[in-house]
């Protein structure tokens, strides 16, 4: 295996383990991974306690797990679409240059 491949593998391992080591044992109790929606809502209520939202969601997921599932599904669909267009453009480029 070439030296640059070994460096790349070590880089991936370090980038994977660094967040796990930095935040081990810390979680939502200390405010990590809290989410932007909750923080924004708290800040709005702090600035203007009489604020009333313009609208309410027509459906809220019954649990956090389903909310996470829908978020992951949305990310997967987006990745598939982006991957399709990268592959399509690569094939078009290869066909043009043959």
From Swiss-Prot:
The chain crosses the membrane at residues 6-26, 68-88. Disulfide bonds: none annotated. GO terms for molecular function: cobalt ion transmembrane transporter activity. It is a multi-pass membrane protein. Pathway: Cofactor biosynthesis; adenosylcobalamin biosynthesis. The keyword Calcium does not apply. GO terms for biological process: cobalamin biosynthetic process. Its main location: membrane. Pfam families: CbiN (PF02553). InterPro entries: CbiN. One of its GO terms (cellular component) is plasma membrane. It is found in: Cell membrane. Keywords: Cell membrane, Cobalamin biosynthesis, Cobalt, Cobalt transport, Ion transport, Membrane, Transmembrane, Transmembrane helix, Transport. Part of the energy-coupling factor (ECF) transporter complex CbiMNOQ involved in cobalt import. NCBIfam families: cbiN, PRK02898.1. Forms an energy-coupling factor (ECF) transporter complex composed of an ATP-binding protein (A component, CbiO), a transmembrane protein (T component, CbiQ) and 2 possible substrate-capture proteins (S components, CbiM and CbiN) of unknown stoichimetry. Belongs to the CbiN family. PANTHER family: COBALT TRANSPORT PROTEIN CBIN. This is Cobalt transport protein CbiN. It comes from Methanococcus maripaludis (strain DSM 14266 / JCM 13030 / NBRC 101832 / S2 / LL). The gene is cbiN.
């Amino acid at each position: 295996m070439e030296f640059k491949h070994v460096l790349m593998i070590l880089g991936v391992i370090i980038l994977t383990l660094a967040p796990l080591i930095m935040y081990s044992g810390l979680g939502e109790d200390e405010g990590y991974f809290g989410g932007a929606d909750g923080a924004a809502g708290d800040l709005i209520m702090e600035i203007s306690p009489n604020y009333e939202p313009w609208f309410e969601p027509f459906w809220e997921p019954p649990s956090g797990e389903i909310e996470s599932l829908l978020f992951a599904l949305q990310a997967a669909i987006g990745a598939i679409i982006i991957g399709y267009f990268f592959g399509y453009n690569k094939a078009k480029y290869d066909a043009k240059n043959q």
